[in-house]
């Protein structure tokens, strides 16, 4: 049985989130949370919350044992970009792309 949790429009780019996501793919939920707790990246806190949410969904909705859960799929997709302009010399502008991402976690027993 697979249980999913999704967080949308995080304030971090998908590239930065994927650094944390790639470390915990395929690990047990408890092991992944302890691994993320000691990471210095601010994205680790968001990824940890999504993993905890998926584990809670499995426990409350499907009566699965949280100790047996393993992260079967985890990925970060690109979300919408906020486009801003920064003034430059000679009346020109250069774009600033504020990127965000969607994080999806699927746990299975």
Curated annotation (Swiss-Prot):
InterPro entries: Ribosomal_uL22 (IPR001063), Ribosomal_uL22_bac/chlpt-type (IPR005727), Ribosomal_uL22_bac/org-type (IPR047867), Ribosomal_uL22_sf (IPR036394). GO terms for cellular component: cytosolic large ribosomal subunit. Transmembrane segments: none annotated. One of its GO terms (molecular function) is structural constituent of ribosome. The keyword Nucleotide-binding does not apply. Signal peptide: none annotated. GO terms for biological process: translation. Keywords: Ribonucleoprotein, Ribosomal protein, RNA-binding, rRNA-binding. Part of the 50S ribosomal subunit. Belongs to the universal ribosomal protein uL22 family. This protein binds specifically to 23S rRNA; its binding is stimulated by other ribosomal proteins, e.g. L4, L17, and L20. It is important during the early stages of 50S assembly. It makes multiple contacts with different domains of the 23S rRNA in the assembled 50S subunit and ribosome. The globular domain of the protein is located near the polypeptide exit tunnel on the outside of the subunit, while an extended beta-hairpin is found that lines the wall of the exit tunnel in the center of the 70S ribosome. This is Large ribosomal subunit protein uL22. It comes from Dehalococcoides mccartyi (strain ATCC BAA-2100 / JCM 16839 / KCTC 5957 / BAV1).
């Amino acid at each position: 049985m697979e249980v999913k949790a999704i967080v949308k429009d995080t304030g971090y780019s998908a590239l930065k989130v994927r650094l944390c996501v790639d470390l915990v793919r395929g690990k047990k939920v408890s092991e992944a949370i302890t691994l993320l707790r000691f990471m210095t990246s601010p994205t680790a806190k968001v990824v940890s919350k999504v993993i905890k949410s998926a584990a809670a969904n499995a426990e409350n909705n499907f009566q699965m044992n949280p100790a047996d859960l393993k992260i079967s799929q985890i990925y970060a997709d690109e979300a919408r970009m906020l486009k801003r302009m920064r003034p430059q010399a000679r009346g020109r502008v250069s774009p600033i792309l504020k990127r965000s991402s969607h994080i999806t976690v699927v746990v299975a027993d």
